[in-house]
Amino acid sequence: MSDGTQKLWGGRFTGETDPLMHLYNASLPYDYKMYKADLEGTKVYTAGLQKLGLLTETELAKIHEGLAEIKKEWDADKFVRHPNDEDIHTANERRLGELIGRDIAGKVHTGRSRNDQVVTDLRIYCRDIVNDTLFPALKGLVEVLIKRAEGEIDVLMPGYTHLQRAQPIRWSHWLSSYATYFTEDYKRLGQILHRLNQSPLGAGALAGHPYGIDREFLAEGLGFNSVIGNSLVAVSDRDFIVELMFWGTLFMNHISRFAEDLIIYCTAEFGFIQLSDAYSTGSSLMPQKKNADSLELLRGKSGRVFGDLTGFLMSLKGIPSTYDKDMQEDKEPLFDCLTTVEHSMLIATGVISTLTVNKEKMEAALTMDMLATDLADYLVRKGVPFRETHHISGECVATAERLGLSGIDKLTLEQYQKIDSRFGQDLFETFNFEQSVERRDATGGTAKSAVLKQLDNLKSQLN
């Protein structure tokens, strides 16, 4: 007897499948993760068949009992896989036949193709991961950033451009910046969820369902928002996977930059923060080392997720319309992307919630040259055009450097007035870091009131 008789597609074949081809073709080693979605889809699909009169109520009840038993086996990690189980669909159908008999189990696939079955499973799986895993994990990360920002609102630090000290900011302003990035990711994920939550079930292999199944009934039963209106698109569309993976790459780009900042801040040269032991590792040779491996892995794994997306895009770009086996290559990069993103969220949350801030070192890193813009603003308030004040302030910086002074605050009033006569005694009030940040109180700025408004706004967006 040919092994083809054990396959869903075996009737046309008389020869044996090459053993390597069987392994090459099989996807159960990774698509088993969709077992819940597959069983759920079959449960609703068979209800649709019963509604058409293609199954009796008794048959439907037996099928649903069998599906429930299979779910228990998977949940308990007791499902026995067979060598001929090609994928999660064939494994579940084979086991259903063992439990309730092949005569009834053989009706389950009536009018359904693995083409619409697998993409239905994928959409359910992605939806569940977004709702049950990604949303809570990302919200938790943002909430930790907000909580920390509120608690350390009075800590000042240098803000950087080009990795050069630029202007004083609040540490909470930095925390709020990444809370903002991640909140945008949170909202973007909701938009993707709306688009992916459409039902392809009932589209058949490509041409549609031969028995006129109620696709709206199937969609409602599976919690989809709508039905994909073209059967060719229904079975072939993988844009929702591309979009979800692109979302993952964008999030990982944000988390990589977040990690890079913290890696810099925790070096001995900066000393702004110290990671907890829970998120650090040591050296096998140098006993004194405390390495920020959690952050370095966040940065490094971003490249992995980028590769998942680009690899799948290369698989997808040249295939003809409707279903092709190339599409089997969607699952491994998708699963890897989603798992990596989830773990990265949890690690980042742990890092930020347990690190220690060295307020003294942050504030000691503030230097008076960072107030050069404030000096220019001082003259603006006296009616001098900003482009002129920018040049004057730059001349003050150059003069202090030429005289070997430690900062522009060390120039005397006489020296200032030689540069520009409009400087007055009150210019020295400019040299105050707290006042500098408090002047920047417009929406989005680093003043305390502005940062607190940012945090309140982020909270409202999460809710």
Swiss-Prot record:
InterPro entries attached to this UniProt entry: Arg_succ_lyase_C, Argininosuccinate_lyase, Fumarase/histidase_N, Fumarate_lyase_CS, Fumarate_lyase_fam, Fumarate_lyase_N, L-Aspartase-like
Keywords linked to the UniProt accession: Amino-acid biosynthesis, Arginine biosynthesis, Lyase, Phosphoprotein
Pathway: Amino-acid biosynthesis; L-arginine biosynthesis; L-arginine from L-ornithine and carbamoyl phosphate: step 3/3
Catalytic activity: 2-(N(omega)-L-arginino)succinate = fumarate + L-arginine
Active-site residues, record numbering mapped to chain: 162 (proton acceptor), 283 (proton donor)
HAMAP family xrefs: Arg_succ_lyase
Further comment found in the protein's record: Present with 10200 molecules/cell in log phase SD medium.
Protein name, per record: Argininosuccinate lyase
